[in-house]
Design a protein with these regions (language model features):
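P-loop NTPase Walker
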Residues: 23, 33, 37, 44-52, ...
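Conserved helicase NTPase motor core
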Residues: 127, 136, 140-153, 160-218, ...
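A basic/glycine-biased coupling hinge at the interface between accessory DNA-binding modules
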Residues: 143-170, 174-176, 182, 234-408
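Helicase P-loop NTPase motor core
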Residues: 213, 220-226, 492-494, 500-587, ...
Length: 684
């Protein structure tokens, strides 16, 4: 059927379209120079209007577009409109049945996802969202018309509501799922560890996000959560033991974790590994070679001897090397260097040996060629760093030569090799769930190993337990932003905070938490104590009062109670401890550096050495160009890592902390603690 404008109407209307033809599933409007095809699946409405003389048809399209036909005889226009409208509505009715079926399928998909007795991840909801949107884009009717049809209206509204508030729907589902699991598995959460898990711990265990950061403050039971998570995956049938990878940072920590798992989960099939042990396993399986880790890695004295021998050789044989080293040590390091053959000076050798060891280690950790190291250094130090790298190159070469002679690899080489094997597909990861302890200590190199493992299977979950407040190993390559910007680095997911400490009282917690959170770069989290503490739970005391303090402690400390004396450096060990065995024989006193105390706890803690200066705490920044270029950037907040060290020291104690300071030259931390209402005592 066709409708045409009258001759006069066409002339007066001066419109591009003067005729319309009904097609099988659409309408064509045209003129002498223009033609427009309107498929029914784009048509939103048809309006028939009467002007002063002629009729007019309007075809409403998406995006507020309207196509008009003018100048038609009114009676003809009405007949054409009724015929077209009936045809369009018949077609629309048929298409609504198809659309209704598609919409019902989307509701079934939503019901399946939300009805499953499983955690609904962000990735899954994103997938459903994408699938629904794709289905909507493939409907035979414009979505703007779905409200018109009884068979589509309700389903369409439900789909829209779910798409509009998808995050709320996900949270609601997961909250209901979590509550159901905590009830159904109440016995498991009560018995999996020596003490029942608290609600925050249990919720972290149940959380099924693919990338989950569990922030575990000092004494909040992180090991319990890791053990319970492994047990939960087994109990729910979500993984077999060989599909669970448990990673710890040190051999001792891995052994302790193994013991806990055997004791609590009654299985020997889940084994905690260090990152190096994991890399070794990947290399063995992926290359059928059994790499030997160099003996030098565990022999500090032998490493120092190797580096000093090569350093002396370079300086004695090459004038340019000797000149470069003298300049480096005097100008940048500001050391006193003897005249003449300074490389033969034993005191200088002893002082430099640990530095050379550290710098070679940083170069190995970077793993790149000299040009790559130089290119990745900050621009403002690149030229100077380039000179330093050239001085260090022979030492790196000597290290590689020693490894070759031993037919061995070093720790950095292990992880590099493992990443290459994973990227080439020579080892296929069997692990569906990766659980990592002390995640705040992770370095970019170890993060790359995790990424390479997860890349092989996008469904591999990462359950990372750590505490950015206790990140104190930047000198070993730890990069705090891998924790504080966890989801940017490891994919979208959740964060769970373990909000209760079982170690220290509320007063120690209040002081330590306020002290660390003065740095806005640290993640904010709650950490509540189960016991109250009085104002004296943290006390500032003159360092001359150490003997008097130990005298007093000897009067009331029980034989089983531990006293931990902590210092920034080994050489700050108090002289009083030389007589401790005879003067305070009943006191259980241990001394260690704050770094070494990580993971330890005691009834009473005495922090010594709160003074300013070269051996002070906070330690003055003494980084060379090598550290500046090869380690993660230093944080903007003053003494950020030293503050975290102080936090670690404060939170080793169950009952009381004494911070001993130098009255003549006090540490800046003393004033900060005073401002946190920590009292200064004249005597213990």
């Amino acid at each position: 059927m066709e409708l045409k404008a009258t001759t006069l109407g066409k002339r007066l209307a001066q419109h591009p379209y003067d005729r319309a033809v009904i097609l099988n599933a659409g309408i064509k409007v045209s003129g002498d120079r223009h033609e427009y095809l309107i498929p029914f699946n784009q048509l939103l409405a048809i309006h028939c209007k009467r002007g002063l003389v002629w009729g007019e048809l309007e075809f409403v399209l998406p995006d507020e577009k309207v196509v008009r036909l003018h100048g038609t005889e009114w009676g003809e226009t009405q007949r054409f409109y009724h015929h077209l409208d009936a045809h369009w509505r018949r077609w629309s009715g048929e298409m609504s049945e198809i659309a209704s079926g598609v919409l019902r399928q989307q509701l079934d998909l939503i019901a399946t996802r939300t009805g499953e007795n499983k955690w609904l991840t962000r990735e899954q909801t994103s997938g459903v969202q994408q699938q629904i949107r794709q289905a909507m884009s493939a409907l035979p009717l414009p979505v703007n018309r779905l409200e018109e049809f009884d068979n589509c209206r309700e389903a369409w509204r439900k789909c829209q509501a779910w798409l509009k508030d998808i995050e709320s729907a996900r949270l609601q589902h997961n909250q209901a799922y979590t509550e159901a699991m905590l009830t159904e598995y109440a016995d498991f959460f009560r018995q999996v560890e020596s003490s029942p898990l608290n609600p925050a711990q249990a919720r972290a265990v149940v959380n099924g996000e693919h990338s989950l950061l569990v922030l575990a403050g000092a004494g909040s039971g992180k090991t319990s959560v890791l053990v319970a998570r492994a047990g939960w995956l087994l109990a729910r049938g979500e993984a077999s033991p060989e599909q669970i990878l448990l990673l710890a940072f040190g051999r001792k920590a891995a052994e302790e974790m193994d013991e806990r798992i055997r004791e609590r989960l009654h299985t020997e099939d889940i084994t905690a590994r260090t990152f190096h042990a994991l890399a070794l396993h990947i290399i063995q399986q992926g290359s059928k070679k059994v790499p030997i880790v160099s003996k030098l890695e565990n022999d500090t004295a032998a490493r120092h001897e190797l580096f000093i021998a090569e350093w002396r050789k370079q300086c004695s044989e090459k004038k340019a090397q000797a000149k470069g080293w003298r300049q480096w040590l005097t100008e940048e390091m500001q050391w006193s260097v003897p005249e003449g053959n300074f490389w033969d000076d034993e005191k200088l050798q002893r002082r430099l040996a640990s530095r050379l060891d550290r710098w070679v280690s940083l170069m190995r950790m970077h793993g790149g060629a000299q040009a790559e190291m130089i290119a990745s250094a900050p621009e403002e130090i690149r030229d100077l760093f380039s000179k330093r790298i050239k001085l260090m190159a022979p030492l790196l070469k000597a290290w590689k030569g020693a490894l070759k002679a031993e037919n061995a690899v070093d720790f950095s080489g292990l992880i590099h090799q493992a990443i290459v094997i994973l990227e080439k597909g020579r080892f296929i990861s069997p692990w569906k769930h990766i659980l990592v302890d002390e995640f705040q200590d992770i370095s970019p190199q170890r993060a790359a190993l995790l990424a390479a493992l997860r890349k092989q299977n996008s469904q591999t979950t990462l359950f990372a337990v750590g505490d950015d407040w206790q990140e104190i190993y930047r000198f070993s390559g730890a990069q705090m932003s891998l924790t504080t910007a966890f989801h940017e680095n490891f994919g979208e997911g959740d964060r769970c905070d373990l909000d209760t400490t079982y170690r220290f009282n509320s007063r120690i917690g209040e002081v330590a938490n306020r002290f660390i959170q003065q740095n806005p770069g640290q993640l904010k989290k709650p950490l509540n104590s189960l016991t109250n503490g009085d104002e004296k739970a943290v006390t500032l005391l003159d360092e001359s009062q150490l003997d008097a303090l130990l005298d007093k402690l000897s009067g009331y400390a029980k034989p089983e109670e531990r006293i931990l004396i902590l210092a920034r450096y080994h050489h700050m060990r108090p002289a009083s401890l030389e007589k401790a065995a005879t003067r305070w024989p009943k006191l259980q006193i241990d001394f260690m550096t704050i770094h070494a105390s990580k993971g330890q706890q005691a009834d009473y803690v005495i922090i010594v050495g709160l003074q300013e200066g070269s051996d002070g705490f906070p330690a003055a920044a003494r980084e060379s160009i090598m550290e500046e270029a090869l380690l993660p950037p230093v944080e903007d907040f003053p003494d950020a890592e030293e503050r975290r060290l102080m936090y670690v020291a404060l939170t080793r104690a169950r009952h009381r902390v004494w911070a001993l300071f130098n009255k003549e030259n006090p540490s800046p931390f003393v004033e900060i603690l005073k401002n946190l209402d920590v009292p200064v005592a004249r005597k213990p």
